[in-house]
Swiss-Prot record:
<keyword id="KW-1133">Transmembrane helix</keyword>
<keyword id="KW-0813">Transport</keyword>
<feature type="transmembrane region" description="Helical">
    <location>
        <begin position="43"/>
        <end position="63"/>
    </location>
</feature>
<feature type="transmembrane region" description="Helical">
    <location>
        <begin position="259"/>
        <end position="279"/>
    </location>
</feature>
<feature type="transmembrane region" description="Helical">
    <location>
        <begin position="104"/>
        <end position="124"/>
    </location>
</feature>
<keyword id="KW-0406">Ion transport</keyword>
<dbReference type="GO" id="GO:0045259">
    <property type="term" value="C:proton-transporting ATP synthase complex"/>
</dbReference>
<dbReference type="Pfam" id="PF00119">
    <property type="entry name" value="ATP-synt_A"/>
</dbReference>
<dbReference type="InterPro" id="IPR023011">
    <property type="entry name" value="ATP_synth_F0_asu_AS"/>
</dbReference>
<dbReference type="GO" id="GO:0005886">
    <property type="term" value="C:plasma membrane"/>
</dbReference>
<keyword id="KW-1003">Cell membrane</keyword>
<dbReference type="GO" id="GO:0046933">
    <property type="term" value="F:proton-transporting ATP synthase activity, rotational mechanism"/>
</dbReference>
<comment type="similarity">
    <text>Belongs to the ATPase A chain family.</text>
</comment>
<feature type="transmembrane region" description="Helical">
    <location>
        <begin position="232"/>
        <end position="252"/>
    </location>
</feature>
<dbReference type="InterPro" id="IPR035908">
    <property type="entry name" value="F0_ATP_A_sf"/>
</dbReference>
<dbReference type="InterPro" id="IPR000568">
    <property type="entry name" value="ATP_synth_F0_asu"/>
</dbReference>
<comment type="function">
    <text>Key component of the proton channel; it plays a direct role in the translocation of protons across the membrane.</text>
</comment>
Length: 289
């Protein structure tokens, strides 16, 4: 790596491959966090976009392959795995979703597998993919992050998609009047029309904050846990470059131990994101508040 200090190494691994408009008016890649910041809102994290799309395609190809090879006879290992996964997700939907919609189970399955695959990239040694990017581009300073869920843009994008579905189903099931009433007539109510009118701003403030908190908490929970996990891997990798034999040996042990524990984290975070999506959409399908 071009960065010789521990801080430079860490900063390089925590920076996205950002493409946007440079100060000179041209378009190109940012080679530092300062350059990426100057690009503003319309900068693109190409590593996040690329890995998200690639892993989504891998998910589709695996399940398509399993569907083509599905048989009523002796199932293969892939078919068994997919069937167990589908039954697990379907059971989770039946337990937590109290409405009727053919979309929820496929959506939950997509979220769980897709988020899990994006999280699982964190198990790849931290230097492998950045070094591969350097070999391909020939640019020793180019940053490249492979774990899409450590980018708040990715987690917030998924959370906003779920939020859009919450709004859509709330209006579809309850009607626009019911949706507005849910935001303005609860949690405080009164039979006195004048008092109820006074309570509308208070109710709206409370319910609006609760509504907005759903996508924000959904995004930040996944981002925070995965970002912290990646940072631990990077800090452990710094031990290998310390030049001290005993510290490098400790790094090997810690790397293995954290990787084993991290398997639980990446699975749990995918499950939590899926379950919260199911619960939020179930609440959107409820007729009464």
């Amino acid at each position: 790596m071009a960065e010789t200090t521990a801080s430079g190494y860490i900063q390089h691994h925590l920076q996205n491959l950002t493409f946007g408009q440079l100060p000179n008016g041209g378009w190109g890649f940012a080679h530092s966090a300062a350059e990426a910041k100057e690009m503003g809102f319309w900068a693109f994290h190409l590593d996040t976009l690329g890995w998200s799309v690639a892993l989504g395609l891998i998910f589709v190809l695996i399940f398509r392959m399993a569907a083509k090879k599905a048989t009523s006879g002796q199932p293969g290992a892939l078919q068994n795995f997919v069937e167990v996964l589908v039954e697990f997700v379907d059971g989770s939907v039946k337990d937590s979703f109290h409405g009727r919609s053919p979309v929820i189970a496929p959506l939950a399955l997509t979220i769980f597998v897709w988020v899990f695959l994006m999280n699982a990239v964190d198990l790849i040694p931290v230097d492998w993919i950045p070094q591969l990017a350097i070999l391909i581009t020939g640019d020793a300073h180019i940053p490249f992050r492979a774990v899409s869920t450590t980018d708040p843009n990715a987690t917030l994008g998924m959370a906003l998609s779920v939020f859009a579905l919450i709004i859509f189903y709330s209006i579809k099931v309850k009607g626009i009047g019911g949706f507005i009433g849910e935001l303005t007539l609860h949690p405080f109510g009164s039979k006195n029309i004048f008092v109820q009118a006074l309570l509308i701003p208070v109710n709206f403030l409370l319910e609006f904050v609760t509504l907005i908190a759903k996508p924000i908490s959904l995004a930040l929970r996944l981002f925070g846990n995965m970002y912290a996990g990646e940072l631990v891997f990077i800090l452990i990798a710094v031990m290998f470059g310390s030049g001290l034999l005993w510290l490098s040996g400790l790094g090997v042990v810690l790397q293995w131990a954290w990787a084993v524990f991290h398997i639980l984290i990446i699975t749990l975070q995918a499950f939590i994101f899926m379950m919260l999506t199911i619960v939020y959409l179930s609440m959107a399908h409820e007729e009464n508040h």
